[in-house]
């Protein structure tokens, strides 16, 4: 409890003194702060020392009209041109965030036209993806190594291996096996991968400094991959009875012909299930990051609310106490949400897969009156 009080005191002092460096006449763009954390980027912004940002420059790999080019993102100028773009080598520029076409993306200027080159650069999101994948491999391979060296009747593992063993078995037993039954071993690798990757990505997104801080599950491309993969597994492994119930369900005939109302609804449901997985995970994680950043941005706004420095300091200090308390609460809530979202995604994926394994309806036993 004593250490918790010291931590909260240091946090309040940090949030109180940091905004004092901001000029009272400087406008705080909350939208830029929020989207700067959520959106993808060719560099990893860490902090700002005075007027100099501290960033990790990432590799740029593009194929333009002049061929393949590999260089560092630091080659792009920090000074923006008349259009608000950041010029770089080989007639390449990074478009500004407010551009109607390709915002924050690399384009090639060919005469008066702007052409989007083949871009396979290692962006912030890709870098976070690699880091989370490495952490996930370590979390799985270390317990796997222990299992290979021990017998089934050996004492239960302790420490990190014991924690991961408990985690894996709880998800497998309570979610996957309880939903899929005998089919559980077949789909357990994918469902366990979904749970642990989403959970690791969510937890790493809460960490405010590298290698954390990336909002991977708040990126629609990441959630689309998981949703589409579950969609493909569900439908390509479905039974004949599953497809029969979609195109010719056991409902009154007038609901199927001449207007195929129920088949259309069932077919539409095939696509809404993965869409629900995608939107639920994306929206929840992006909203959590946005709310946490909003509490921090309120401090800077209150320190620049008027021209009176004393009034700004009083308002900012008072809001700092409230903001730090709410931010701490949101961080704890984000940890809980990180687990819940990973569990819900895995559970719904298992349910959707189980619904595709419909067996032939057996004849009901006759009831003796």
Describe the role of every protein-language-model region.
Residues 2-6, 20-158:
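Perimembrane topogenic segments of multi-pass inner/organellar membrane proteins
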Residues 115-117, 169-183:
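Cytosolic juxtamembrane amphipathic/interface segments immediately preceding
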Residues 138-176, 238-245, 360-361:
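Juxtamembrane interface elements at the cytosolic ends of transmembrane helices
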Residues 209-213:
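Membrane-interface helix termini and inter-helical loops of multi-pass transporters
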Residues 6, 179-189, 283:
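Membrane-interface helix starts
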Residues 4-11, 130, 187-191, 219, ...:
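Alpha-helical transmembrane segments
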Residues 192-196, 200-207, 217, 221-225, ...:
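Hydrophobic alpha-helical transmembrane segments and adjacent short intramembrane/lumenal linkers
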Residues 10-19:
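Bacterial N-terminal signal peptides
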């Amino acid at each position: 409890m004593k250490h918790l009080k010291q931590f909260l005191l240091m946090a309040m002092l940090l949030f109180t003194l940091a905004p004092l460096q901001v000029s009272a006449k400087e406008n705080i763009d909350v939208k830029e702060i929020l989207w700067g954390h959520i959106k993808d980027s060719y560099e990893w912004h860490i902090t700002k020392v005075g007027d100099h940002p501290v960033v990790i420059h990432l590799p740029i790999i593009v194929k333009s009209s002049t061929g393949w080019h590999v260089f560092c993102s630091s080659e792009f100028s920090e000074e923006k041109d008349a259009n608000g773009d950041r010029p770089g080598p080989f007639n390449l520029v990074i478009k500004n965030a407010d551009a109607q076409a390709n915002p924050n993306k690399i384009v090639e200027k060919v005469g008066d036209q702007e052409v989007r080159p083949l871009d396979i650069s290692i962006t912030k999101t890709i870098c976070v993806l690699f880091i989370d994948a490495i952490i996930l491999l370590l979390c799985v391979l270390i317990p796997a190594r222990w299992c290979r060296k021990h017998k089934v009747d050996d004492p239960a593992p302790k420490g990190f291996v014991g924690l991961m063993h408990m985690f894996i078995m709880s998800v497998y037993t309570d979610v996957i096996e309880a939903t899929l039954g005998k089919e559980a071993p077949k789909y357990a690798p994918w469902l366990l991968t979904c749970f642990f990757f989403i959970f690791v990505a969510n937890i790493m997104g809460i960490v405010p400094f590298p290698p954390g801080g990336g909002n991977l599950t708040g990126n629609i491309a990441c959630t689309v991959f998981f949703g589409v993969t579950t969609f493909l597994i569900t439908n390509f492994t479905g039974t004949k009875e599953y497809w029969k119930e979609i195109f010719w369900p056991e409902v009154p005939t007038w609901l199927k012909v001449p207007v195929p109302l129920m088949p259309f609804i069932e077919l539409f449901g095939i696509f809404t299930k993965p869409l629900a997985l995608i939107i639920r995970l994306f929206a929840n994680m992006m909203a959590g990051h946005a709310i946490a950043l909003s509490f921090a941005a309120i401090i800077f706004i209150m320190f620049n609310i008027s021209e009176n420095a004393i009034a700004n300091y009083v308002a900012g200090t008072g809001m700092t106490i409230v903001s730090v308390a709410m931010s701490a609460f949101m961080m704890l809530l984000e940890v809980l949400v990180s687990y819940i979202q990973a569990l819900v995604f895995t559970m719904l994926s298992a349910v959707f897969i189980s619904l595709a394994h419909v067996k032939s309806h057996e004849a009901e036993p006759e009831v003796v009156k």
